[in-house]
Amino acid sequence: MQTIETHSVLEAALEPWSEHLGAARVAYRNHAYRVFNFARGLLGHANEDETLAVTSAFHDLGIWSDRTFDYLAPSQARAREFLERRLPSAPAALIVAAIEHHHRLGRVRGGGGAGLIDAFRRADLVDVSRGIYRAGLDRGFRREVLACFPYAGFHGVLLRTGLAWWVRHPLRPVPVLRLAGKELEPR
């Protein structure tokens, strides 16, 4: 699969948040593009590019938009706002579900776009693990994506943000993890 270096929807989604992202802007943009490309590679087709672009742009954005490490609900809210304004015909429920489940421990199964949601979950894990978890992606493709979108300190930002959260919330150290459970309902 060819690496996509720019996508108009992903750019339009991120642009208004440049100031909130601050010094992490390049790191987060690159992360969003790596996850977008890895998810495309896992799906094996480009039929869902717009959905993946929106999901990639917003999946972790709540860290910066709402200044919290409990960021899934804020990220979903920002995605919904964007969709209402810019892409009202996009599959909002699927995008919100993909954001909700992207840190799920275990495979996403069932109906309702489970294949896309699980591909997105695995793509994010490939990136967050720095390729230790490969999800079956070709090594050459991963290297090509990383050459276009280097880490730029993204993992350090996550580590610092996560540790700061943990100090203030020791009983909820990783609030964004989701346990595998029931299958998704068909839509």
Q: Can you name each region flagged by the protein language model?
A:
Residues 79, 100-101, 124-125:
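Hydrophobic alpha-helical segments of small multi-pass membrane proteins
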Residues 1-8, 13, 20-46, 87, ...:
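Divalent metal-dependent phosphate-bond-processing catalytic cores, especially two-metal-ion Mg2+/Mn2+ enzymes
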Residues 50-66, 71, 75, 96-103:
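His-Asp-centered metal-binding catalytic motifs of divalent-metal-dependent phosphohydrolases/nucleases
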Residues 88-93:
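Membrane-interface starts of transmembrane alpha-helices
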Residues 25, 65, 69, 85:
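Short gly/ser-rich anion-binding loops that grip negatively charged ligand groups
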Residues 35-39, 70-86:
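An active-site-proximal "capping" alpha-helix that borders the catalytic cofactor pocket
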Residues 8-16, 52-57:
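Short amphipathic alpha-helical segments, especially helix-boundary/capping motifs
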Residues 18-23, 59-62:
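Short coil/turn segments at secondary-structure junctions
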